[in-house]
């Protein structure tokens, strides 16, 4: 594992602490079907049944999925558990940062990166509008 892959795993650990990451088949399935998942990550040594279930989750909720260059053990160790074959990022900025942290994947999946960039811009715009609204309410402007 090189340094960029290690940084990407550390970003996943940070997303877990921020509660922006679902780990395991059932929580990922719930996040995908409810539309909360922004990116589904599958370990490259996951079983065929796991791949089939992940694809069906993505068809139901429309998030993109990626086969990451980590084994189940590497992915699990980065997240603080024994093994993890499937995890879902539920925050667009984290998903975009993770994909940008792995340049070999980002080059292959430009369309996913563009969609995550668009979603991140929408999130940032909503935060700015909310901040302006709170300021206007505080100072009595309408």
What annotation goes with each model-predicted range?
Residues 2, 6-7, 11, 141:
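Long, amphipathic alpha-helical "stalk/connector" segments that mediate intersubunit docking
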């Amino acid at each position: 594992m090189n340094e960029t892959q290690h940084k990407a795993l550390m970003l996943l650990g940070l997303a877990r602490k921020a509660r922006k990451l679902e780990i395991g088949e059932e929580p990922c399935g719930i996040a995908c079907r409810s539309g909360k998942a922004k990116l589904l990550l599958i370990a490259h040594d996951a079983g065929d049944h796991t791949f089939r279930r992940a694809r069906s989750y993505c068809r139901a909720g429309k998030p993109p999925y990626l086969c990451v260059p980590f084994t189940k053990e590497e992915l699990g160790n980065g997240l603080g558990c024994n093994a993890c074959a499937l995890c879902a990022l539920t925050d667009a900025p984290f998903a975009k940062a993770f994909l940008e942290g792995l340049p070999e994947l980002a080059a292959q999946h430009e369309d996913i990166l563009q969609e995550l960039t668009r979603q991140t811009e929408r999130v940032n715009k909503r935060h700015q509008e909310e901040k302006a609204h709170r300021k206007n309410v505080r100072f009595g402007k309408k």
